Amino acid sequence: MQDQYILALDQGTTSSRAMLFDRQGNIVSIAQKEFEQIYPQPGWVEHDPQEIWSTQAGVAAEAVTRTGLNGTSIAAIGITNQRETTIVWDRETGQPVYNAIVWQDRRTADFCDSLKQQGLEAKVRAKTGLPIDSYFSATKIRWILDNVPGARDKARQGKLAFGTVDSWLVWNFTKHELHVTDVTNASRTMLFNIHTREWDSELLELLDIPRSMLPEVKASSEIYGHTKTTVFASKIPLAGIAGDQHAALFGQMCTTSGMVKNTYGTGCFLMMNTGDKPIESRNNLVTTIAWQIGDDVQYALEGSIFIAGAVVQWLRDGMGIIKTAAEIEALAARVPHTDGVYLVPAFAGLGAPHWNARARGSVFGVTRGTTSAHLARAALDAIAYQSLDVLAAMEADSGISIGELRVDGGASANNLLMQFQADLLGVDAVRPQITETTALGAAYLAGLAIGYWKNLDEVRSQWQLDRRFSPSMPKEQVKQCMAGWQRAVRAAKAWADDTQ
């Protein structure tokens, strides 16, 4: 296998990407194509499933051919994907019965509220690790069955298939032969029992979803089948599947209990490996399956922050304070601190661990001396404060003190932000040389399944440090900063409470 590579397919919310990795875990080739976001009504978000497939197949071929290679050079394919996004298709024709309903879509929020009012939240959380929310796949499937003419009848006859994006891609890559998913994607549907690792009959009955629609659930690293499409002339093993954040956790080599990664993107996604037992959160985090390799199942706690890098985009597009996102570090560095200014970027409410949908963005502590530099610094600081809130909840739930934070995503390139994050945490923030950890995780899962890499120790040894940020702020100053942030969050919540 000297001249072979692993192809990682990274199907995201706004684009489909493909990357070729060599045996040392280096990126050899990359291709990307954006696709259309469909907004039929306020709060609704859809994708065209055929466009998801065509863009993903297209970039897969492009990543290979632009290096002068062909399908015979690909040892295996690993897939990672936007999670929860729901596709239902006709088994006979292979055609979707409706657009993909995206994870951001809120059309089933009222139905979720009615389930909560029936007192079902504790039961659902105990089985799935998830709160009842329109974010997850279950109520999206139910909506399609209730609103697409003929869908429920076809589903009862076993003629419809449901899948998250990974299932849809495998179905198409195998010319409609394989209907599978992996445990990580299944664990985000709100239909999968994370303890028994099976589809939950009681939840299926509760939501009136026929079991015949659901894919077979497999490990995250095994040979599921082989490609049969015209994208590649040769048959390539499909050998790794994981949801995007799970793949990033694996790509960061957070393979032992207590290891944590934070992906700094438009929002932040923090995930902690909690070992071979699920931990039920008492602090509004999500319990999920991290991955499964062979019989070894690892679990995780996850917290999502809605607005992280998006606050920088707001300073650029909404306020005109900067012309490009990259300018924020230099602007913020003009001042040593925010001079008491706090920005709570609750533009879409507050995510974990607060879960306050009504909170709104607020700026506190502004004086006549406040400048655009103070505001820029407050925006960066807010990303670190929000991350600390989630990490504190993770420590409380798990009883594990975090040893270091592994960071990736676009905003992890901001050295000022990473230093402040380390200062607040009191432990090192470490940035790897390869920050494309999501695709790398999918590649590792696929490569391990076929013996391209011998074992976990071999891939672990490939993780390489780019830069380590060690805490340097005095503890008393950290305490003062945190007290101000907590006061600002309380004030943002109070502003949203119109009963006061």
Curated annotation (Swiss-Prot):
Enzyme class: transferase
PROSITE patterns: FGGY_KINASES_1 (PS00933), FGGY_KINASES_2 (PS00445)
Residue positions binding ATP: 13-15, 266, 309, 313, 410
Activity regulation comment: Inhibited by fructose 1,6-bisphosphate (FBP).
Gene3D superfamilies given in the database record: 3.30.420.40
One GO process term, biological-process aspect: glycerol catabolic process
Binding site for glycerol: 83-84, 135, 244-245
Functional summary from the UniProt entry: Key enzyme in the regulation of glycerol uptake and metabolism. Catalyzes the phosphorylation of glycerol to yield sn-glycerol 3-phosphate.
HAMAP family listed in its UniProt record: Glycerol_kin
This protein's name: Glycerol kinase
Higher taxonomy: Bacteria, Pseudomonadati, Pseudomonadota, Betaproteobacteria, Burkholderiales
Designated gene of the protein: glpK
